[in-house]
């Protein structure tokens, strides 16, 4: 709290009580480094019709607020506004709009979906860009058909995607497995909402992580991404296509209802600097030794590549004729159910995840760990990560040693990265907006870490103070090293007053 005598300054220095709000603006400017010249431009635009005298008076009020802060207050927090980057360099987008723009920037050519809250607007935003680029948008009869169409379009050579929410993701489970089995690249955007069943269609939750990671019968390679902001949604959409195309597998991108409607300003993406990855296509002219041809048959699922990635054939290419089927198959795509072929083909498919972890994983992990012996290390994802960043800043300004890790690639998991981060902190806290603590459970399953899980599931995101409060609670209770906690543990009966 910073006390500033706004009324006194306005009355006695400026001689105009009505300027109290401008004095307050000056105080905020002094405290948080707001752009003075931009504010003066706004004052001039607002008051110029009332004459130069009024404009000058408001300038004085602004300066008076700034000067009071400089001369009388000691700043106790670490917050300030970054220098403005200029309106011409800024775009303002909602989360779903950023996803749509990112998918188009990645080269998306086909979009099929069935309308569902809160994912519908992804299609609304993407349609104009697709039409302009001779792409296709199709409203399917249901979510099952929409993913089937996207897989078919991808098999035909197009970069393809669908978008849905939790109920639709449930319906897509079999075709997610089909995309993994056939090694077909496809992007699935899941704008999460409160479940199960119809749940609360317009409310926020991070409840679909288990389904994204494990959904479908059997086991397939897949990647699961989660942006942490609107700006991040643009770039993670590009990365979703890059991973799908490079590793020929389904990639699920988890966002949520709150982020889908949230508008943010961020620097205009420079499309020329984006790294765009395209799939490996069979080219008979490059395959001089005919490594991928045996007995006149194209080896779509050849077993001899070190990373499991084999060239895809485009329908119509007489040199790359093959079948696509959900049945297990041998190298030339003919169905087979021999134990040895099954084992070899499973190993081939999962080699791709090994390559992903080796070549691409690290850039998806943001680690903010300035302390070697932090009081608490926080790991979290999605919108909760964005909120946690503000809480971490506040906690550090109070002298607490807090490290943080924000994974954007939630599956596969590179265990040693989590283990390395955990060594820098005495305890690990994982806040999430779901009941089980889904990321916390995955971390426990894949690593030796035993985190403290903090969960809310009321249909709303955390606020930064709630992250601060759980950290304060843990600092007061040093004996707590693991377990699951909810607001009731922190606030008692008052917890329900937060809802």
Task: Report each predicted region and the residues it spans.
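Short helix/loop capping segments that flank catalytic or ligand/cofactor-binding pockets
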Residues: 112, 121, 172, 197-198, ...
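Active-site cofactor/cluster-binding pocket
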Residues: 1-106, 110-112
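Thiamine diphosphate
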Residues: 117-214, 223-244, 397
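Short hydrophobic alpha-helical runs that function as membrane-insertion/retention elements
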Residues: 112, 138, 160-162, 186-189, ...
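Acidic-glycine-rich active-site phosphate/pyrophosphate-binding loop
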Residues: 1-4, 37-38, 70-81, 117-130, ...
């Amino acid at each position: 709290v910073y006390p500033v005598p706004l009324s006194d300054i306005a009355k006695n220095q400026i001689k105009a009580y009505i300027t109290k709000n401008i004095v307050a603006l000056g105080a905020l400017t002094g405290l948080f480094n707001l752009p003075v010249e931009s504010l003066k431009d706004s004052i001039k635009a607002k008051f110029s019709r009332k004459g130069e005298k009024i404009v000058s008076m408001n300038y004085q009020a602004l300066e008076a607020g700034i000067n009071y802060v400089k001369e009388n207050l000691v700043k106790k927090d670490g917050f300030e506004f970054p220098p403005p980057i200029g309106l011409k360099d800024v775009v303002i987008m909602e989360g779903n709009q950023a996803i749509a723009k990112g998918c188009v920037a990645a080269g998306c050519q086909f979009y099929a979906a069935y309308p569902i809250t809160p994912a519908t607007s992804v299609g609304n935003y993407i349609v104009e860009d697709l039409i302009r680029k001779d792409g296709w948008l199709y409203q399917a009869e249901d979510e099952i058909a929409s993913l089937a169409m996207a897989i078919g379009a991808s098999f035909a050579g197009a970069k393809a995607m669908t978008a849905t929410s939790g109920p639709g993701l449930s319906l897509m489970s079999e075709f997610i497995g089909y995309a993994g089995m056939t090694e077909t690249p496809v992007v699935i955007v899941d704008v999460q909402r409160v479940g199960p069943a119809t749940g609360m269609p317009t409310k926020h939750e991070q409840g679909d992580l288990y389904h994204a990671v494990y959904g479908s019968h059997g086991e397939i390679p897949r990647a699961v991404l989660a942006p942490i902001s609107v700006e991040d949604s643009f770039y993670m959409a590009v990365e979703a296509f890059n991973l799908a195309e490079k590793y020929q597998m389904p990639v699920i991108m988890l966002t949520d209802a709150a982020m889908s409607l949230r508008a943010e300003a961020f620097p205009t993406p420079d499309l020329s600097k984006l790294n765009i990855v395209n799939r490996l296509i069979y080219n008979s002219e490059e395959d001089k030794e005919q490594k991928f041809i045996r007995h006149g048959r194209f080896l779509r699922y050849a077993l001899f590549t070190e990373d499991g990635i084999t060239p895809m054939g485009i329908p119509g290419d007489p040199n790359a004729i093959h079948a696509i089927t959900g049945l297990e198959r041998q190298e030339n795509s003919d169905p087979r159910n021999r134990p040895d072929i099954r084992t070899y083909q499973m190993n081939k498919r999962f080699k791709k995840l090994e390559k992903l972890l080796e070549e691409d994983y690290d850039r998806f992990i943001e680690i903010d760990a300035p302390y070697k012996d932090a009081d608490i290390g926080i790991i979290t994802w999605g919108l909760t990560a964005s909120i946690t960043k503000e809480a971490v800043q506040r906690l550090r300004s109070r002298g607490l040693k807090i490290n943080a890790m924000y994974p954007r690639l939630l599956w596969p998991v590179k265990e040693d990265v989590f283990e390395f981060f955990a060594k820098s902190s005495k305890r690990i806290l994982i806040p999430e907006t779901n009941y089980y603590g889904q990321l916390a459970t995955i971390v426990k399953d894949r690593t030796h870490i035993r985190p403290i899980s903090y969960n809310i599931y009321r249909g709303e995101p955390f606020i930064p103070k709630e992250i601060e409060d759980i950290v304060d609670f843990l600092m007061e209770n040093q004996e707590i090293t693991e377990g699951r906690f909810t607001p009731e543990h922190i606030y008692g009966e008052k917890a329900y007053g937060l809802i």
